From Swiss-Prot:
Coiled-coil annotated spans: none
GO biological process, one term: translation
Protein name in the entry: Large ribosomal subunit protein bL21
Leader peptide range in chain numbering: none
Self-association and partners: Part of the 50S ribosomal subunit. Contacts protein L20.
GO CC term (a single one): cytoplasm
Family membership noted in the UniProt record: Belongs to the bacterial ribosomal protein bL21 family.
Gene Ontology molecular functions: rRNA binding; structural constituent of ribosome
Record function comment: This protein binds to 23S rRNA in the presence of protein L20.
Record's keyword terms, sorted: Ribonucleoprotein, Ribosomal protein, RNA-binding, rRNA-binding
Keyword flag Membrane: no
Gene field: rplU
PANTHER family: 50S RIBOSOMAL PROTEIN L21, LARGE RIBOSOMAL SUBUNIT PROTEIN BL21M
Pfam families: Ribosomal_L21p
Amino acid sequence: MFAVIKTGGKQYRVAANDVLTIEKLEAEAGAIVEFTEILVVGVGADATIGAPFVAGATVKAEVVEHNRGKKVIAFKKRRRQNSKRSRGHRQHHTVVRITDIVAA
C-alpha cells in the first residue's frame, strides 16, 4: 500500500517502513505524528485520488531525528567597489519513519 502525502509544501510518495527527510516538524524524537493531508492512497493501480484530499485517510509516522541540511552560501559581490558579502544558511529537517497507512 502506498500514499502520497503533503507536508511542508511538498508532496511525498510513501509506503510502510519508508524513511524520509521532510521540512522541520515541531515534535520530539520518538514521537508519533499523523499526516491527514493525503492526496492519493491505494495498492498498485487500484488507487483512490482525493479532491483535493482523501477523506478519512491518515498516515502515521515516528520521528527519528532532527538535523540540518548542507550549508548554502549566499555570496554578493559589487564590482569595482571592493565590497562583498557572504552569508550562510542551513535548513532544519526532520527524519521520519512511516509506520502505518490507514485508508478510508
